[in-house]
């Protein structure tokens, strides 16, 4: 009863998180809700399913690693997966510096100001300096040239993002890889790339498979993603995959024997739900590559439709001309905003009255004066629902323009 008046999950256009799975997947996860993944002795098949999921993602991202099993780890979400990728980069750097007899007290990593908050947590918790490259209205993704200017011998990694939370855009990992390759060759440093692909990791392989952003690139050593975003599984579930086992420091593996057998684990958390692993494995074998391609293609088509229609509305301008993920942002035209008696925050509140959650927010540092709105399209959001949302936006604008105060 207490949750009845809340926004219905499928009307929440703010979240990236999966809000729809078919009834069989839902039933499967409900029946597995008591499974603790870490109890591999009791649930050995769940561990095998997890390893198979890691193999599938590694292959999606063109892993060159040989052998039956690829190197990766399960996480509670993409935040833990990012942490694991970051810690691995830090430990590799630290071990190399110690072997060379050099100080290890001033590590740093580089990322754009469009980062997700987990990277701020990573910097604070591990006392690693976060160097940021500003996003601007002219440079709306990570600028490789600006990255190189921030690099030094203490840089543990650079973190490009595929599916920036603020904008929905992708950093150019291929250009960054080329810039880092030249820099590393010139300086003798070995600065790698960790790709934060929380959203894009499950979009690019199906929508733009020829684009090089993954393990095909020399300096990409690890990739993290979210299973509970475009991996199409209910929360919480994340994944991280390394290019090869040699890039996963041994210090990150912990063993216990008090669960009935020797169990080795890579992760910040110990207990974790097994139901999400079953959900991911179900989606992989139920949908297959073609099924995922169709789902993501449909989400992209609906997002493009909304992007086009909102761009035609008199008050608005889209942040980018095209979209590369099923999400986009827009802002109020400057000349319209000067005379308008309403703001995007008012539109957010108005749409909430109809059940929609379409967030309005300020952009990150250096362009924080810009207020935008964002729509995230996910599986379960239909063309009919898109038309309903557009109708409510148009009706809200009509009501606002009648205001006389």
Features from the language model and the residues they span:
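N-terminal entrance/gating region of PLP-dependent enzymes' catalytic architecture
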Residues: 1-70, 355-358, 373, 392-393
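A generic structural motif
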Residues: 164, 286-289, 334-336, 377-383
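Short, conserved charged micro-motifs
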Residues: 336-347, 383-388
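Short Gly/Ser/Thr- and Asp/Glu-enriched loop/turn motifs at secondary-structure junctions
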Residues: 67-69, 104, 320-327, 368-370
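Active-site C-terminal subdomain of aminotransferase-like
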Residues: 206-325, 331-336
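A common structural junction motif
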Residues: 351-359, 394-401
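Conserved PLP-enzyme active-site core in the AAT-like
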Residues: 73-251, 259
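PLP-dependent enzyme catalytic core of the Aspartate aminotransferase-like
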Residues: 183, 365-405
